[in-house]
Design a protein with these regions (language model features):
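Active-site core segments that coordinate phosphate-bearing ligands/cofactors
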Residues: 1-187
Length: 187
C-alpha cells in the first residue's frame, strides 16, 4: 500500500534504503497497520491504519520505517498473546517477499527479541506440501526429520539489545495508541 500510494514509483529496495536512514523507533512515529481492520490478536474489523507522531522534522524515511516497525509490533503483539496461553516461541522463521529485506527482518528480530532464520527457499507453500507428502508417504519418519533434511538457512539474524530496548518502549506506546483510538474506529 505505502509503495503504491506514497512511494513515488520507488522499488522495495529503494524504500528500504530510505527507511534505514531513520533510527530505530522512527523518532516517535508509530504506524498502526490495520489497513483492512485487524484480526489476531485484537479482532477488530473496524480498526484503521494510523500514522502517529508526525511533525515537520519527519521524513518519508521515518514513515517507511514506521510501517516496517508497525508490522513487527503486530507480530510481537501476537507473540505476547500466544505466551499468555502458554505458547512460547524462541526462534522465528521468515519466508516470502518480506524476508528478502535484511532491514525488515532485523526490525522484527529487534522488536520481538527473537532469533529469525531465513531459509534458502522462499517457496514455503510448495516446500511445506512436499514435506507433508514426504512424511505421509514414509520418506521421512517425522516432520522434524523432514524439516531438518530439506530446509537450509540463508541467514540468521539475532536481535540487537540496544534496539530491543528502544522497541520495548515503542511497543508500549503502540499498544496504548490502539487502546486510546479503539472507540473512534467504529464512528
Amino acid at each position: 500500500w505505502f509503495r503504491q500510494e506514497l512511494g513515488g514509483g520507488m522499488s522495495f529496495d529503494e524504500l528500504t534504503a530510505e527507511a534505514a536512514e531513520a533510527p530505530p523507533g522512527s523518532d516517535g512515529v508509530l504506524f498502526l497497520p490495520y489497513m483492512a481492520g485487524e484480526r489476531s490478536p485484537i479482532w477488530n474489523p473496524d480498526a484503521k491504519g494510523v500514522f502517529y507522531g508526525l511533525s515537520f522534522d519527519k521524513t518519508r524515511g521515518h514513515l517507511i520505517r514506521s510501517v516496517l516497525e508497525g508490522v513487527a509490533f503486530s507480530l510481537e503483539h501476537n507473540l505476547r498473546t500466544a505466551a499468555e496461553t502458554g505458547i512460547h516461541v524462541d526462534t522465528l522463521n521468515a519466508m516470502g517477499g518480506a524476508s528478502n529485506s535484511v532491514l525488515w527482518t532485523q526490525i522484527k528480530a529487534d522488536v520481538t527479541g527473537k532469533t529469525i532464520r531465513v531459509p534458502s527457499s522462499d517457496t514455503a507453500t510448495t516446500l511445506g506440501a512436499a514435506i507433508l507428502a514426504g512424511v505421509g508417504c514414509g520418506i521421512y519418519g517425522s516432520y522434524g526429520e523432514a524439516v531438518n533434511r530439506t530446509i537450509r538457512m540463508t541467514r540468521v539474524q539475532e536481535p540487537n539489545p540496544e534496539n530491543k530496548a528502544v522497541y520495548d518502549r515503542a511497543m508500549e506506546r503502540y499498544l496504548r495508541l490502539y487502546e486510546d483510538l479503539k472507540e473512534g474506529f467504529s464512528l
